[in-house]
Amino acid sequence: MNRLTNISKIRKSLIDGKLKVNDLVLNKIKEINKVSPNHLNTFISLQDEKSLGKQIKESQERYDNGTNKRLDGIPIGVKDNFSSKNFKTTCGSKILENYIPSFDSTVVKLLKEEGAIIIGKTNMDEFSMGSSSTSGHFGKVINPWSKPNNNNNNDNDNNNNGEVLYVAGGSSGGSAAAVASNYCVASIGSDTGGSIRQPSSYCGVVGFKPSYGLISRFGLVAYASSLDTPGVLTNNVEDAAELLDILIKKDQENDSTSIEFINNNQNQNQNNGEKRNILDEFNEKLKNKNIKDLVFGIPKDYLVKELDTDILNLWKEVVEEIEKRGGKVVSVSLPHTRYALPAYYLLATSEASSNLSRFDGVRYGYRFEEEKDENKVDNDNDDDDDVDENKIGMGLKDMYTKTRTNGFGEEVKKRIILGTMALSRSSYDNFYTKAQKIRRLVSDDFKNVFQGENKVDILITPTAPSPAFKQNEKMDPIEVYVNDIMTIPSNLAGLPACSIPLKLSNSNLPISVQLISNRLTDDNLLFAAHTIMNFDCYKDFTSLTPNYLK
């Protein structure tokens, strides 16, 4: 099955008996290990053979009996910050290297209930803190569009045989690279400031972040709880719609969904407040709507100096293609976009400093253990019950300090320190409170565009200011943070956003545009994304094979 084959076509082949679940799943495993085990380092861990065999057998039996579920036998990758029962969940960190949860996250549970086969847990930046998937404890993810050498030896970022390795983006880089490489049909990621959309752009796949609160966060290891959003990475928009339809459920057992998908569109011939099925809404729009029915906004504030020429040209080209087909395009202003990046890093790190305080070596995860000196003689002649409480206190403090110092990577420690500073008494008003005010202003900017005079339906922007950069490229930390400048605003406002790959840059790397819509108009966003991806000039992109797989 190639990248062009969507879930519905795979399911039909399985129902018709033209394809067996065993062949589908084991071919994916074979591809992952084709050159050497996990060659692109997309997965941290794969499902064990016994569990995999059991799931394959059960799925095939349901197909044979005509009782198959929607995702039966479909291999799905899951980012390694979603808890999965009896399956390591590491968050890409040494501190959780051997942590095995006793429960499934709601996202994993919903996938399993529909018969999906969780083929493995995908690699990521540690605790989702990064934009390149190079900061994790389990090594760097290689972008499948990298240029391989003749010997397929990836010991160095760039070697004498002409190999050039590019980052996969982050923090869901493993998920994006796995889908682009056809190692799984689709993958699950999390998006806090662009962590689904930016790697999707770098790897040339569809990345969809839904409205905040639609998909349950229960079992998603928190980075910044008010921003973290589960989402999907696929090769086409149809698969994104199908997965979202399964995952968008009010979580009755936990409080990590805040809203239900209701009719939020005044123009629809339905009663406001009526619950909707996102897949049905998407399919209905495909039948009865076209590009002429939408108003597209072009935010001039996204025209930043860091914008790559190829991406700028693609942005202009998409606008021209929409206008050629009768779509209405207007220029809009989001004036507080310039403040979104610093506000985000203050808010996200503040929440992270609190969320990550639980990793202390006491309750679960890695604990620092000092090496015992076998030759050390205990000269303490005091009675055993004569305990020095000060020594115990210092020992516990040392254990906390050394556990977190050795268990967390440099980027995570940097962000914890920044967040702790922002929440301190002397800095709270000057930093954290101001960042919250900026968040409100950014949200109001979007509200004015979507509900203002032009009634914009969809905003079109670049996804990232540049294509993927080289793995060994020396970059100032601020330059790295700027890679999220296009994606962060929609997280601050809780809006749905989608990255769609459309063509290759002059350096043969995927480039994309981002679409953003109003809250709870996720179905409209899916329709717009599908329509643009199927313009004649773009529809062949997903048939291209990434360089590293040729």
Curated annotation (Swiss-Prot):
The active site is at residues 79, 171, 195. Keywords: ATP-binding, Ligase, Mitochondrion, Nucleotide-binding, Protein biosynthesis. SUPFAM superfamilies: Amidase signature (AS) enzymes. GO terms for molecular function: ATP binding; glutaminyl-tRNA synthase (glutamine-hydrolyzing) activity. PROSITE patterns: AMIDASES (PS00571). InterPro entries: Amidase (IPR000120), Amidase_CS (IPR020556), Amidase_dom (IPR023631), AS_sf (IPR036928), GatA (IPR004412). Its EC number is 6.3.5.7. It holds the Pfam family Amidase. It comes from the Eukaryota. It is found in: Mitochondrion. Signal peptide: none annotated. One of its GO terms (cellular component) is glutamyl-tRNA(Gln) amidotransferase complex. GO terms for biological process: glutaminyl-tRNAGln biosynthesis via transamidation; mitochondrial translation. It catalyses: L-glutamyl-tRNA(Gln) + L-glutamine + ATP + H2O = L-glutaminyl-tRNA(Gln) + L-glutamate + ADP + phosphate + H(+). Its main location: mitochondrion. It is an enzyme of class 6 (ligase). Residues 371-390 are annotated as: Disordered. Allows the formation of correctly charged Gln-tRNA(Gln) through the transamidation of misacylated Glu-tRNA(Gln) in the mitochondria. The reaction takes place in the presence of glutamine and ATP through an activated gamma-phospho-Glu-tRNA(Gln). Belongs to the amidase family. GatA subfamily. Subunit of the heterotrimeric GatCAB amidotransferase (AdT) complex, composed of A, B and C subunits. This is Glutamyl-tRNA(Gln) amidotransferase subunit A, mitochondrial.
